Regions:
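Alpha-helical transmembrane segments and their membrane-interface boundaries
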Residues: 3-76, 80-83, 87-89, 108-160
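Proline-centric
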Residues: 99-105
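The feature identifies polytopic integral membrane transport proteins across all domains of life
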Residues: 88-98
């Protein structure tokens, strides 16, 4: 309960709202991609955890590094739940990375190009590219972990 008391109450409430928004956005994206209903809760949880990890690490790191770390958590949880629920990892991964995808960066890059502010367009575009590369590298990293690790962690020791 101390988490919600004192001067940190506003920060705590903001974090809870952001977590909730990320969960809802992730579930909406899962709905768009026709993920089976029984996985909506886990998809939302993965997206929310990814966003909170991003926000926490953004306090100390740059956006690309924060995105990389948060997406490692998203991919790890996606693989773990995929083994646990015996379904493809993409069920959780595609919707789980939704809060971390640099959509605003792409928008602002295009906006600055259209308004002929090429310096800002270059800066935004390069940052967006770094975030996109961070997402790809984090996916590659976690997919290098052996499948047996996820079987052990999920308590699912049978080969499928």
């Amino acid at each position: 309960m101390a988490f919600f008391c004192g001067r940190n109450a506003a920060v705590s409430v903001r974090i809870l709202w952001e977590f909730l928004a990320a969960c809802i956005g992730t579930v909406a994206f899962a709905l768009l991609f026709q993920v089976p209903k029984k996985y909506y809760g886990l998809c939302g949880l993965i997206g929310g955890i990814g966003w909170i990890c991003y926000e926490i690490f953004l306090l100390w790191c740059s956006a690309p590094i924060s995105t990389f770390i948060a997406n490692v958590a998203v991919v790890f949880l996606s693989r773990l739940f995929a083994v646990k629920k015996r379904c493809p990892v993409t069920v959780f991964l595609i919707s789980g990375i939704f809060p971390l995808v640099p959509g605003a960066g792409i928008y602002w890059t295009a906006y600055y190009i259209v308004t002929n502010d090429l310096e800002q367009a270059g800066q935004r575009g390069f940052l967006t590219l770094k975030v996109a590369v961070a997402i790809v590298l984090s996916i590659l990293l976690v997919f290098e972990f052996p499948q047996g690790l996820f079987r052990k962690l999920s308590g699912n020791t049978k080969n499928t």
